[in-house]
Amino acid sequence: MRFLMKTATLAGLALVVLAGCKKPAGSGSSETKPAFTQIDWNTAGTISGTIHCAGKMPEPEQIDMAQDPVCSLSPANYSEQYVGKNGGLQNVFIYVKDGLGNKVYPVPSSPVVVDQKGCRYTPHVVGAMVGQKISFTNSDPTMHNVHMIPTVGGNQTADISQAPNGQPESRIFSKPELMMPVRCNNHPWMQAFVNVVENPFFAVSASDGHFEIKGLPPGTYTVVADHEVLGQQTATITVGAKQIATQDFTFAAK
């Protein structure tokens, strides 16, 4: 009888130990993922505006592409630093810098695509979210090179050769960075700028300077407009539910 009681006691202790070692329901070794904020289109507002260029915009400079016979056939052989029409300024990156609090938005699954066509990067300025894939394609029948030169720690330099009409090459950046330069080592006139931010609320101004940032929850925001040569401007703007708030920026031509 004493032996049976001792055996039962040991068995009970074993069950207690096993129960104590059991993982809580839902626990795992990986870190808890943040709860993403979804855009509420029933209340979302919009920031709309125009980027103006005060004064006479410098004339685009013609580029000598004679070093590559393929490139010399391109009609788009003018510089892209100052581009626009009717006083509007193109290729300005506009984004919401502050005002979203602790909201975290999902990274788009589709990549941002930059093509090398006519020996130019198209588009000249792009935006992406931190962690979003940026894909470079080569539609030209000539060799190109994608040389990305970040200045923020944690973002890795990329130096990629792409064969004529070759396969896309992609990179992902883990830190926010504005106006990250992209160059082609084979064609020194080729340049583009990549902007990486932490939310999906950004835009690039069109040829007439117009831009729109949609899907914003009602609130007050700090908005930044950044140009590759003319620098940054900042504004504070309040967006109401289902409202379009207007915010223009004016850069002085250099």
Where are these regions (language model features)?
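Bacterial N-terminal signal peptides that target proteins for export
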Residues: 1-9
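Extracytoplasmic copper-binding redox domains, predominantly the cupredoxin/blue-copper superfamily
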Residues: 21-254
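Short, low-complexity interaction segments enriched in Ser/Thr/Pro/Gly
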Residues: 3, 19-20
